[in-house]
Amino acid sequence: KFARRVRRRLGFSQAEFAMRIDVSLETIRNWEQGKRSPTGAAKALLKVLDKAPEVALAALQ
């Protein structure tokens, strides 16, 4: 569960993470439970958050 690993490493709750990356809490839950997988821009954003979290979070401010 890549999204969960990224979120936990950043220290965010599901709700905080959803707000930061501008997706619904339900979407975060679905990703983390394996019901859905991030695609497109969301998948790319998760990869950037994994590799360069400070840069990505600053850009999301």
What are these regions (language model features)?
Residues N30-Q61:
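Short, Lys/Arg-rich amphipathic alpha-helical interaction segments
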Residues R20-V23:
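Long, hydrophobic/aromatic-enriched structural stretches that serve as scaffold segments
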Residues F17-A18, I28-W31:
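Conserved hydrophobic/aromatic packing and binding residues within compact polymer-binding modules
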Residues A3-E16:
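Short basic helix-loop element that most often maps to the first helix and adjoining turn
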